[in-house]
Structures are given as C-alpha cells and as structure tokens.
C-alpha cells in the first residue's frame, strides 16, 4: 500500500516535470515568434502573423491517442510517440506568409526540425490544408538541457475558418 502511494506520488512528480518542460518549450517558441514578427514589422513594415495560439494536450486526449495507436498509457510512450503534446498554431493572412514563416523558423539555431508535413502542397482527403513542423527546443533547467518537442502549425485565416467548418458536426432541422 505504501509502495503504491509512493509510486503514484513519483508519477505525479514526473508528470508535473514533463508538463513544466512542455510549457517552457511553448514559451520559448512563442517568444521567438514574437521577436520574428517584430523584426519583420521593423524591416518590412508588415506583420506576417495575425495571431498565435498554443496549448498542451490534456491527459485524457493523450491517453486516447496512445490507445488509438495500440500503445500502453505510459510516460515513455507519451514522450516517444505523441509528437503534438505541446502545440503552437500560427495564423497568418496569406499563403506566401506560411512559407516565409516556415523558412524563418527553420533558421532559428535553437530549434531542431524533426520533420515537416506540407498539407498545403499535399492536402488531406478531407480538404485539410496546413503546414506542420515538428521541432525540438532545448529547455535549460538546473539538471541540464532537455530537448522538448513542439508541433508548429501554420495556416491562413481562411484555412482556419474552413477547417472549423470541416470538423464541426452538422445539425439538420426538420
């Protein structure tokens, strides 16, 4: 009984530590994006970023995704197989801004790009269009550097609106 309680306490601490890293990674990415947007305004008198949203996946959502992939709900599986626990969505006005922002993000020395999915050039069957980048961000803590994954999605306002319409349930009136 005491071992079980201690294990739950350890798991809670591990979970909190992991969420700390993901939150810190989102802060790092958002700070870089804000600076890039400010610099772009300074140089070109134009802001490519309309707005930025970020989120951490809920424990329930993570568990469901692991289950869909046939994986046991463990911290190791979560870190290894769920790439969008930390997510940042950038919404811009024009399609050209998407590629300009992706290029600027790719030039950030602190970010390591793990992969890119270009649903702009290759839309999903559902019509979904967006540009996804999975990066790692080095998070410096007192225990060292922790590379932490963040998924960045870049899309236009029009895509954000049309994706909402694609995913909302339809209701019919009789």
What are these regions (language model features)?
Residues 1-81:
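Charge-rich, low-complexity segments
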Residues 83-85, 128-130, 145-149:
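Short connector loops at helix/strand junctions that flank enzyme active sites
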Residues 86-92, 152:
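Short cationic amphipathic helices and targeting signals
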Residues 94-97:
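Helix N-cap motif at beta-to-alpha junctions
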Residues 99, 111-136:
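Beta-rich nucleic-acid/ligand-interaction surfaces
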Residues 101-106:
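Short amphipathic alpha-helices in soluble, non-transmembrane regions
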Residues 149-157:
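Active-site ExK catalytic segment of metal-dependent nucleases
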Residues 164-170:
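Conserved small/polar residues in nucleotide/adenosyl-binding loops
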């Amino acid at each position: 009984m005491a071992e079980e309680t201690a294990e739950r306490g350890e798991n809670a601490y591990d979970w909190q530590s992991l969420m700390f890293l993901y939150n810190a990674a989102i802060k790092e990415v958002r700070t870089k994006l804000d600076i890039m947007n400010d610099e772009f305004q300074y140089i070109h008198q134009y802001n490519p970023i309309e707005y930025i949203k970020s989120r951490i996946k809920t424990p329930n959502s993570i568990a469901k995704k692991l289950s869909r992939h046939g994986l046991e709900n463990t911290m190791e599986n979560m870190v290894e197989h769920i790439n969008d626990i930390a997510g940042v969505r950038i919404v811009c006005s024009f399609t050209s801004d998407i590629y300009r922002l992706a290029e600027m993000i790719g030039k950030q020395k602190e970010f390591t790009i793990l992969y890119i999915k270009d649903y702009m050039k290759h839309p999903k069957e559902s019509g979904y269009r967006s540009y996804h980048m999975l990066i790692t961000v080095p998070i410096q803590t007192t225990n060292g550097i922790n590379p932490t994954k963040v998924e960045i999605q870049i899309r236009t306002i029009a895509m954000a609106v049309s994706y909402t319409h694609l995913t909302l349930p339809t209701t019919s009136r009789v």
